[in-house]
Amino acid sequence: MKKRFSLIMMTGLLFGLTSPAFAAEKTETEAKAPANVAVLLDASGSMAKRIDGVSKFNSAKKEISKFASSLPEGTQVKMSVFGSEGNNKNSGKVQSCEAIRNVYGFQSFNEQSFLNSLNTIGPTGWTPIAKALNEAKSSFDQLDAKGEKVVYLLTDGEETCGGNPIKTAKELQKDNITVNVIGFDYKEGYKGQLNAIAKVGGGEYFPAYTQKDVEKIFTQQSLMLSK
């Protein structure tokens, strides 16, 4: 009787391990490809403001580099900076609003190359968020890779170049690109637009008031992308 019971139990276990549901679950886990991550950093003049003695721009650069280095092996990372040319006066608006610099194209993370790509850039001009999102979309369109597609937009302000970032974020979401927004020491009046960008982009809006806040957000996101 005991022999028969053991045989039945073993048969049931074997069936469970070879069932279509188990096989599908195993295949899905094994087949999950690394993510493709684009970080868009605001280099408008207001990012020069210092918090605890460090400019918001430099704080953001440091935390973005730590975030990129913590991503799972095989993750394709891209870094763009927007508004880094011209100046934040009317005389420099046209140049600044056209300034989307793809400083680190989609590739695996290399710390030295990543840091070098940002060495000569500082906070200068206006805030062309829509154009930066559109440039990210074009980069994803040219990327031949599997895995989820995720954008992290870090800014301290709203669109100032006449674009429509909410409409653009919606276009990214149609292409299955998730848009997350980090509002870094932003003016309260900008929250509506930043939150709307994340909402239509299928992502989340994260308020950050200090470098420590930015660090916590990126740590959380790195853990999520590692699952």
From Swiss-Prot:
PROSITE patterns: VWFA. Keywords: Signal. Residues 1-23 form the signal peptide. The keyword Signal applies. Residues 36-227 form the VWFA domain. To B.subtilis YwmD. This is Uncharacterized protein YwmC.
